[in-house]
């Protein structure tokens, strides 16, 4: 099917899609919307929101969910369940419910967060509830025009390359985008049937407890922290974890807002995104600035040095964390202790690990 055929087919889907597509007069934009399907990989789906096969919308989300559901049904016997969550981005909640409905239509029980939550809480739910898989609706630190669909396995980790390729084969076997919602009932109907179960309070409490259990340093500290969630999901859980610390929150960026009105891109590793945080840090004479992206799986760190705030790179932050963890655990290290690094991570953390006598695996 060529681009024009795809375009004309999508005009028949629903009134809103038709209206949006008819408003597009630029042939190059039409081509960009339909020249390929939105790619599914180890990071799931990610793209600009809008109508078209190369966009994030209800149909591409539904198709991905249907393919993922069919993959799970072939892989597992007995009752299958998935955990689903979303961040603060535009349309995230709608995409979460779209996914939930499709999974439920395939006989898969869905545990859906009723509040926006960070990615780690989705991974936690997948394990805590003994789910076979998880889905997070988010585009991480991308600009407001984007959204995405991250897929997780039963361990709460993103799909590995081989699994992602297999899921993709199921997705690609679905030719008709408009058919993904055939015989799919409403969210309320699936809730009544017990196929969609809303979750939040218990999982939030258990997650916070699990995070605090990992702490290696519980002594009182005079450290003053500035924190910004950058309009994302981190505000409530991060403040809860740090409730016994001195924390100043950037008020202008405190509330969830998918338009991210105070930043161009909500990437905490970009100094521009931490401008307000650094201004507050100077006002409060804080020691450190922490910022998290919308789905709260990325942290930016700025530390006070000679009266100025220096933004650390991810590699620098990681190396400091490695040094801290190994220092605190040095008495329990042995000949089998191992540090695992990715190929895109600098050697600094690995060298620190070796200095403590650890084996290093890449």
Residue ranges of model-derived segments:
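Glycine-rich phosphate-binding loops at beta-strand->alpha-helix junctions
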Residues: 87-93, 229-236, 345
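N-terminal small/polar loop signature for handling phosphorylated ligands or for N-terminal nucleophile
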Residues: 83-146, 248-300
């Amino acid at each position: 099917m060529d681009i024009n055929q795809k375009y004309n087919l999508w005009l028949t889907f629903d009134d809103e899609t038709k209206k949006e597509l008819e408003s597009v007069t630029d042939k190059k934009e039409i081509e960009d919307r339909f020249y390929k399907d939105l790619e599914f990989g180890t990071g799931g789906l990610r793209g600009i929101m809008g109508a078209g096969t190369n966009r994030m919308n209800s149909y591409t989300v539904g198709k991905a969910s249907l393919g993922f559901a069919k993959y799970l049904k072939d892989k597992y016997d007995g009752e299958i369940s998935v955990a689903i969550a979303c961040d603060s981005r535009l349309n995230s909640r709608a995409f979460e419910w779209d996914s939930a409905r499709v999974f439920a239509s395939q006989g898969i029980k869905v545990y859906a967060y009723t509040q926006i939550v960070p990615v780690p809480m989705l991974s936690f739910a997948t394990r805590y509830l003994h789910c076979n898989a998880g889905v997070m609706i988010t585009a991480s630190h991308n600009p407001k025009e984007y959204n995405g669909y991250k897929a997780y396995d039963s361990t709460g980790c993103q799909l590995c390359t081989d699994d992602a390729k297999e899921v993709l084969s199921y997705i690609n076997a679905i030719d008709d985008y408009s058919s993904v919602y055939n015989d799919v009932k409403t969210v309320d109907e699936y809730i009544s049937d017990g196929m969609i179960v809303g979750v939040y309070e218990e999982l939030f409490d258990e997650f916070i407890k699990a995070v605090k259990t990992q702490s290696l340093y519980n002594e009182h500290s005079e450290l003053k922290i500035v924190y910004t969630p950058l309009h994302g999901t981190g505000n409530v859980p991060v403040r809860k974890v740090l409730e016994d610390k001195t924390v100043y929150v950037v008020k202008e960026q405190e509330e969830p807002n998918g338009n991210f009105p105070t930043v161009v891109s909500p990437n905490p590793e970009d100094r521009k995104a931490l401008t307000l945080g650094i201004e507050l840090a100077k006002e409060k004479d804080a020691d450190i600035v922490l910022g998290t992206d919308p789905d709260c799986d990325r942290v930016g760190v700025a530390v006070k040095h000679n009266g100025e705030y220096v933004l650390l790179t991810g590699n620098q932050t990681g190396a400091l964390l490695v040094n801290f963890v190994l220092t605190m655990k040095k008495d329990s290290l042995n000949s089998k202790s191992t540090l695992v690094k990715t190929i895109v991570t600098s050697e600094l953390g690995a060298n620190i690990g070796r200095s403590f006598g650890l084996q290093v695996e890449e």
